[in-house]
Amino acid sequence: CNGRDVPCDPDPAKNRRCCSGLECLKPYLHGTWYQDYCYYVEK
């Protein structure tokens, strides 16, 4: 799985999902073209 701050893809077929506890999100303040990254999300 992909660790924190590593590029990811929400498409499961690409097998670039984030590790447990991380979510695949677009960086804040970037355009929609921008790569998704794994971020730690407080529950």
Swiss-Prot record:
Location of this chain's protein in the cell: Secreted
Coiled-coil ranges (or none): none
S-S bridge residues: 1-19, 8-24, 18-38
GO terms under cellular component: extracellular region
Tissue-by-tissue expression: Expressed by the venom gland.
Annotated Pfam families: Toxin_22
InterPro entries reported for this sequence: Toxin_22
Protein keywords: Disulfide bond, Ion channel impairing toxin, Knottin, Secreted, Toxin
Domain of life: Eukaryota
Gene Ontology MF terms: sodium channel inhibitor activity; toxin activity
Membership in a protein family: Belongs to the neurotoxin 14 (magi-1) family. 02 (HWTX-XVIc) subfamily.
The record's note on its domains: The presence of a 'disulfide through disulfide knot' structurally defines this protein as a knottin.
Role description: Probable ion channel inhibitor.
Protein name, per record: Hainantoxin F5-22.36
Source species: Cyriopagopus hainanus (Chinese bird spider)
